Amino acid sequence: MERIKELRDLMSQSRTREILTKTTVDHMAIIKKYTSGRQEKNPALRMKWMMAMKYPITADKRIMEMIPERNEQGQTLWSKTNDAGSDRVMVSPLAVTWWNRNGPTTSTVHYPKVYKTYFEKVERLKHGTFGPVHFRNQVKIRRRVDINPGHADLSAKEAQDVIMEVVFPNEVGARILTSESQLTITKEKKEELQDCKIAPLMVAYMLERELVRKTRFLPVAGGTSSVYIEVLHLTQGTCWEQMYTPGGEVRNDDVDQSLIIAARNIVRRAMVSADPLASLLEMCHSTQIGGIRMVDILRQNPTEEQAVDICKAAMGLRISSSFSFGGFTFKRTSGSSVKREEEVLTGNLQTLKIRVHEGYEEFTMVGRRATAILRKATRRLIQLIVGGRDEQSIAEAIIVAMVFSQEDCMIKAVRGDLNFVNRANQRLNPMHQLLRHFQKDAKVLFQNWGIETIDNVMGMIGILPDMTPSTEMSLRGIRVSKMGVDEYSSTERVVVSIDRFLRVRDLRGNVLLSPEEVSETQGTEKLTITYSSSMMWEINGPESVLVNTYQWIIRNWEAVKIQWSQDPTMLYNKMEFEPFQSLVPKAARGQYSGFVRTLFQQMRDVIGTFDTVQIIKLLPFAAAPPEQSRMQFSSLTVNVRGSGMRILVRGNSPVFNYSKATKRLTVLGKDAGALTEDPDEGTAGVESAVLRGFLILGKEDKRYGPALSINELSNLAKGEKANVLIGQGDVVLVMKRKRDSSILTDSQTATKRIRMAIN
């Protein structure tokens, strides 16, 4: 206070003011400070005094020919005196105004293309809606966020190659454009920027904004997608927030969101298959998101989410070293532990085998709606400081931390038996058993935990067993903070391994992720996700399974038909028929299968009874393990649309309807494709009937001797080949089948093969 008073007195004397404003600065140290190096030491001041000068700008001499000396108002636009120390002209700010109004114009067609990200941002803000401002304490936590809406996901190196190719195509240097996205973008941009007069360096800068994801570690409360981050300064302050709805979406946010949904669906589906890891990989490789292969997106997209990270681990990509438990991301910030198996007894006297972490450790816990700092020792929670959006979110974090601590009072709080299972009906591991139990009801856990009196610490309050705040008492070791806990900022990635049950471990063997950690939240994807794998047919319900199964048979009919006649068992075991089984009533599966297989065998044995449409219709039913029974069926039931619907063994039904006129199949009213051949049996040629039991291999082959007549064929041994004369004097090579069971009665196939062999 004294100093301020003294300064005020000094300033009130006119002499002080005069000294401060008029005296020249001639102290060498000061001059050195402000003149050494090219970096401006005080940009704001420099700008102020430059603009106070008459000619603060320097320009090339050519400007004197392009701009008049005076404007319409008679004000001087440039000075005849040269700029000291350079061969340039001193120019007034008024010259800029003159140039903007009267200078040469150029084509503006390329501006929206080059400055695309800016134009799009203006549109988003124009159509965005700003709501009311609310004043409240903001719990912000630093998260790594995408600050650059509307970008592709190229790596810096990939983007550099694209930029060089587009902007400086004639520069020397090897550029390898390999990925599909690189090639597409390069082609598109070259066309867009033909005859572009904007400075190449500027174009390069702007392209970089479009191609590369830029992330920053920023304090955020609320939305983290890039269209919210670009208005962060407008939507949240220290003690206020403004509601905002973006006026448009950008593809990069949509990709992130759709990727998470696809990954969750795939992990959930893989869990219940016989070989989860193989299934997961098959699905990742056959899925597209917004028309781009999912595996390409996984390689480039830095999104960290449990399901996405499991997919990345399966592909052999590095992922973050933090681990996941109860939907929270744990990152150890100090301490260490060794793991030891220990048997513990629950309050219900059930024995659990848990892996105990021995040693002192500190963790940060980050969830979507709550964050915490946890300090623990062996089977003991020392301190938990938690911050969150609401009571519910804080409670979730407390439960997870209590279970993670492995304290005895938590295990003793279990009432009833623990027998939670995952989607594949396998028992969960003990830690997840405990977690599920208390997530359902944590009353006993909170009651038994114990409470303590607390000191008054700024920004911290206590929380009671019923989750109400208190300034006097709190659950033992637990405090609620007004501040959030920052997410782990490092982008370091580590090598991990994954086992067949999709458990991801680091090189030390610590489990970082398991399918139990994948959220059950369902969302609607912003971009179209195309799952080509039959394992994902059921994602859109029973109808989709039905339509997809029949579409698959029709698409692959040529191959299916040959297998049907030669190797039916292999055909019945195809994974494409797996989803269909869930539609067939459990009790009837085996009987239907036995019935259909017998029917098919009769078709193979009795000439002329082959019926394409009927085979297609009944084939999926033959995939279940068959029961030997003499039962006959005139219709088979499938469970769709919430009830049993019938497929008629002979003839059409609403479920399966083949139109002879259009040769198209409709399943539940949806088009399932066309049969390219004529399934009408009247066209069956006599040759195909006579050649029953022989496989047509192709054109005549002289090595197998002269052509036999059809009657002479009966003398061939199984597996023997011969040329045979058929029809109008054509010769084809045939082989007598090795197995009677797989005799080809498919008249179309035989006729078709004869045709192919002749032509």
From Swiss-Prot:
Avian adaptation, annotated site positions: 627
- Organism superkingdom: Viruses
> What biological-process GO terms show up in the record?
7-methylguanosine mRNA capping; cap snatching; DNA-templated transcription; symbiont-mediated suppression of host gene expression; symbiont-mediated suppression of host mRNA transcription via inhibition of RNA polymerase II activity; viral RNA genome replication
Q: Cellular location of this protein?
A: Virion; Host nucleus
The alphabetized UniProt keywords are:
Cap snatching, Eukaryotic host gene expression shutoff by virus, Eukaryotic host transcription shutoff by virus, Host gene expression shutoff by virus, Host nucleus, Host-virus interaction, Inhibition of host RNA polymerase II by virus, mRNA capping, mRNA processing, Viral transcription, Virion
Q: GO terms for CC?
A: host cell nucleus; virion component
Q: Which Pfam families match?
A: Flu_PB2_1st (PF20947), Flu_PB2_2nd (PF20948), Flu_PB2_3rd (PF20949), Flu_PB2_4th (PF20950), Flu_PB2_5th (PF00604), Flu_PB2_6th (PF20951), Flu_PB2_7th (PF20952)
Query: Which terms in the Gene Ontology molecular function aspect does this entry carry?
Result: RNA binding; RNA-directed RNA polymerase activity
At which positions is motif Nuclear localization signal? Answer: 736-739
Q: How does it assemble?
A: Influenza RNA polymerase is composed of three subunits: PB1, PB2 and PA. Interacts (via N-terminus) with PB1 (via C-terminus). Interacts with nucleoprotein NP (via N-terminus).
HAMAP family for this protein: INV_PB2 (MF_04062)
| Similarity comment text for this entry | Belongs to the influenza viruses PB2 family.
Its function, per the record, reads: Plays an essential role in transcription initiation and cap-stealing mechanism, in which cellular capped pre-mRNAs are used to generate primers for viral transcription. Recognizes and binds the 7-methylguanosine-containing cap of the target pre-RNA which is subsequently cleaved after 10-13 nucleotides by the viral protein PA. Plays a role in the initiation of the viral genome replication and modulates the activity of the ribonucleoprotein (RNP) complex.
> What is the protein name for this chain?
Polymerase basic protein 2
Organism taxonomic ancestry: Viruses, Riboviria, Orthornavirae, Negarnaviricota, Polyploviricotina
* Name of encoding gene: PB2
